[in-house]
Every structure is written in C-alpha cells, then in structure tokens.
C-alpha cells in the first residue's frame, strides 16, 4: 500500500530562500508522527506544505496519491490544519464558524457533535469568537477541525492554550482519530506530552529530516 504522505528530496521556498531543503518522509494511514526540532527548523513549513498551502518546487511530493506539485487544491479537500492561526472569524459565533467549516469542507459531520467532542457547552457556542479566551478559541478550532471530517490532521503545537482538561481531551481525540484511520502529523516542543500519542518521531533541523526514531 502506498503511503498517505510521501516526500522525497522535497524542497519548499519562502520567497527566494529554501525553507525545506530536501525533506524525506513517508507516513502510512492511521499513523501518528511527531515532528520535533528547534524553532525555525521547518516543522510548521512542512505541515503547511503537506496541507497544500506552501508549494513544493522540487522533489517528489504526494498526499493520498495526489501530486502536490500539480494540484495543491485537491489535497486541501482532505486535510485539516490546526495551527497558530485559528482559522476562525472573530465576528461569528463558535457555532456559526463550525457550520461554515462543515459547509466549506462539504462534510456530512454534525456541527453539534463536533462541538460536543471539543468540550464546548451550549451557552459558549453562541459567543462570538472575538470574545473568547485563548482556551475557548482553541476548543473552537478543535471543533472546526473535527467537523471537516478530514483524512489527515496536521497539528502545530496543538496543546498550546489549553488547560489540563482540554489537553486530556485533545489527547483522547488524537487517539480516537488514529484508531479510526486518520493520519496525523503533530509538531510539538512538549515532548513529554506528545510522545505517548505517536507511533514514531521525525527530527527536523535546518530544513531537513535528519533522523527517524521508532517511539
């Protein structure tokens, strides 16, 4: 079976400069892979490249068999990115944002179920995102991720902004999703938190994948 994510000598540019300069990575369906490395190593750029948001200019790059160099838009239909930017509209309520993402992804997932799974109570759902605390915004982003029913999750420092209860909830969601066959790439500096969730770890440094460790 072909890997869900396949990168071989993949190069990405930010402006004229290489942000990723020869990435090699294969990820199978249902695997959870931790990307670790120092700030500026290229972890976020790698996630954005897999999401089809940053072009791969050289090398091999396929996601779900789709050539990233030819059709990034087709890839975006199948991935959900949880990053530093929330992807939410401040003037809309949580519920309105989650419904928007369900429609944008043409998903059949129920927004109410996604909000339940993200631990968002009924009263909070009607608050505008611009009025939320950092933790509430993160849960809203989680609900938007869940409702897209994506085959690949790309999580950039996903525990950031969550309290202890929210962190436990996120861990459970990752385990459940992987058990259901969702492929997950997770970038984190919180190694003690993230390592128990993953199948293996990839070191990213200087725009390269330097080492692969079996967790």
What are these regions (language model features)?
Residues 145-146:
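ABC ATPase C-loop
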Residues 59-70, 75:
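Conserved ABC transporter NBD signature motif
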Residues 51:
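Helix-to-loop junction immediately C-terminal to a conserved catalytic motif
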